[in-house]
UniProtKB/Swiss-Prot annotation:
Location of region: Disordered: 275-346
Protein name: Golgi-associated RAB2 interactor protein 2
Top-rank taxon: Eukaryota
Gene expressing this chain: GARIN2
InterPro entries (alphabetical): GARIL-like_Rab2B-bd (IPR022168)
Family: Belongs to the GARIN family.
GO biological process, one term: flagellated sperm motility
Primary residence: other
Assembly and interaction partners: Interacts with CALM1.
Organism this protein belongs to: Macaca fascicularis
Compartment(s) where it occurs, according to its Swiss-Prot or TrEMBL record: Cell projection, Cilium, Flagellum
Length: 346
């Protein structure tokens, strides 16, 4: 046309079902010149979405590849005198289209698909239109030398896939991962038995605890600071000094599995396959020996004081009894003397 020097649209059409007689062979109906009112437009393909190439130059066969990846092969069916001219026109058109595509790719690095959709209006391919004034069809002639072999390689254009509407392509950020805040979970289970004072100086139960802590790395420092503050503070009702408390803390066992720390304090231990577990009897004996060694001098001193107080009480009791016996004897003697003196006076 006068406005477009380079063709940009490819029209495909086929005969209407009623235009061909049943007795007429298919290749004869394709090579004859059909009237314009018997042609039906099946495809409206912009050449920007189609890749044309020469598949077989000897047999004058072309290849049409769509954007979807599906490929078709076209065989020229015309008279012998026009075959070379028509095929040379197709070859020139293919080279021209390839040059234009190369120029477009050099100008912009953006995908050619988005640029074409912004500048070209694509009509829906599902609409089937009857062309009443289709006068640009060349009149083919029957050639005796080439017969059914052309029909074998021809294609039914009604089987073309539909072209869907193409929207603009927007750039998406690559490798963008949303920042997820760290999840901090601290689970602590504590079981503590406090010792109480016994009046009869029996064995005092030691404070024991079992602590299971699941910590993240960022909370270890805060926990350590809290533990340092509580080192020199004794819980009420617990008869344990700072020395024994530090000894109990030294006996704690740590087992680290990646970011999880298991802390076991006191005499109780969990039966696991990861840490060697000491027998409960041995640990209890060691703790009892320590407490007995610390408390034996106190028990001895209290026992001596109790014996001295008892001896003092018995001595005071015996002395009081002797004084009372003497007073009773003195009273008896006085009564006897009075009784003896009364008859003499009478």
């Amino acid at each position: 046309s006068s406005t477009h020097k380079i063709p940009n649209v490819m029209l495909l059409a086929h005969l209407t079902p009623g235009s061909r007689k049943d007795t007429e062979p298919l290749f004869k109906s394709l090579l004859t010149s059909p009237p314009a009112e018997k042609l039906v437009l099946t495809r409206f393909l912009p050449l920007q979405f189609v890749t044309l190439s020469v598949h077989d130059a000897e047999n004058m066969r072309l290849k049409v590849k769509l954007v979807s990846g599906r490929a078709y092969y076209l065989q020229l069916c015309t008279s012998a005198c026009k075959q070379d001219t028509l095929f040379s026109q197709w070859v020139a058109l293919i080279s021209l289209l390839n040059q234009e595509k190369a120029k477009v790719s050099k100008v912009s690095e953006v995908s050619s698909l988005s640029g074409i959709t912004n500048s070209t209006d694509v009509t829906g391919s599902t609409d089937v239109m009857d062309i009443t004034a289709f006068t640009a069809i060349l009149t083919p002639y029957m050639y005796a030398g080439r017969g059914p072999e052309h029909v074998r390689d021809s294609i039914d254009f009604s089987e073309f896939t539909d072209i869907t509407d193409i929207t603009d392509v927007t750039d998406l950020p690559e490798n963008e991962v949303p920042e997820v805040p760290d999840i901090r979970i601290v689970t602590e289970v504590i079981e503590v038995r406090e010792a109480t004072e016994v009046t009869d100086h029996s064995d005092i139960t030691n404070c024991s605890g079992v602590t299971v802590v699941f910590e993240n790395n960022d909370l270890i420092r805060a926990k350590q600071e809290e533990k340092e503050k509580l080192k020199n503070i004794l819980k009420p009702g617990c008869l344990q000094d700072t020395k024994s408390k530090s000894e109990l803390k030294e006996s704690s066992k740590h087992v680290t599995i990646s970011n999880i720390t298991l802390t076991f304090e006191g005499k109780r231990y969990f039966q696991t396959t990861l840490t060697p577990v000491e027998s409960e009897a041995n640990t209890s004996k060691e703790m009892e020996n320590k407490t007995s060694e610390e408390k034996t001098p106190d028990f001895q001193s209290t026992a001596l004081e109790a014996e001295e107080s008892r001896s003092l009480r018995t001595e005071s009791n015996t002395s009081g009894n002797e004084c009372e016996e003497r007073k009773v004897k003195q009273k008896k003697t006085k009564l006897v003397e009075k009784h003896v003196r009364q008859p003499k006076d009478f």
